[in-house]
Design a protein with these regions (language model features):
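Contiguous beta-strand segments within globular domains
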Residues: 43-93
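Bacterial Sec-dependent N-terminal signal peptides
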Residues: 1-31
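Ligand-binding face of N-terminal immunoglobulin V-set domains in extracellular IgSF glycoproteins
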Residues: 129-155
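Extended low-complexity, serine/threonine- and proline-enriched intrinsically disordered segments
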Residues: 83-112
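Sec-dependent signal peptide cleavage junction
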Residues: 23-47, 51
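Short acidic/polar inter-strand loop motif in beta-rich domains
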Residues: 96-98, 142, 156-163
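Short structured motifs
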Residues: 58-62, 116-121, 134-138
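Extended, solvent-exposed segments with strong compositional bias
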Residues: 109-131
């Protein structure tokens, strides 16, 4: 029996946290003290709207993956600030109370827990200028190997000290 089938019934639940984070892979180094004590499904930047986390191709799905599978989730959101920004992300394992787990990254992620949101599309023929962002994750260089709750933390790479 392969790992894919052995873990197929252990769900992984995600919430979106638009918060700042530590991101060593892309030259951004922030203190762990900046992370919230408890992750919440909140938006901290007034320009961010229409946040959706779902299974690709299924608009009303829950943000749940099977541990050990190569399934992905799709994150979409709009930035109404009018400027294209560079966003990064980090994935954290959380306990049942959505507090950051004490486990080291290597025990719950194989590969890199950080990345960059590369897909951005400018609006056209609209009253307001905005950019739509899209991320499919986990990416090729990341595999979630532990079942549990995960927080997807999004931050602005240009100004990582400000909450997005």
């Amino acid at each position: 029996m392969t790992n894919r089938f052995r873990f197929s019934y252990l769900p992984i639940l995600f919430i979106i946290v638009t918060e700042i984070t530590t991101n060593f892979a892309f030259g951004l180094t922030l203190s762990e003290e900046i992370l919230p004590d408890t992750f919440k499904n909140e938006i901290y930047d007034a320009g961010i709207h229409t946040v959706l986390l779902k299974t690709p191709g299924w608009e009303f799905s829950l943000p749940v993956l099977d541990a050990g599978s190569r399934d992905q989730l799709e994150l979409r959101f709009d930035d109404l600030s009018g400027n294209q920004r560079n966003f990064g992300y980090t994935i954290y394992l959380c306990n049942a109370g959505w507090e950051k787990s004490e486990l080291p990254e290597q025990e719950y992620i194989s590969g890199f827990p950080t990345g960059v949101i590369r897909e951005a599309r400018a609006s056209f023929n609209t009253t307001y200028d905005y950019f739509s962002y899209r991320l499919l994750f986990p990416e090729e260089n990341c595999e979630l190997i532990q079942s549990g709750n995960y927080a997807l933390v999004i931050f602005d790479q240009e100004n990582p000290d400000n909450i997005v």
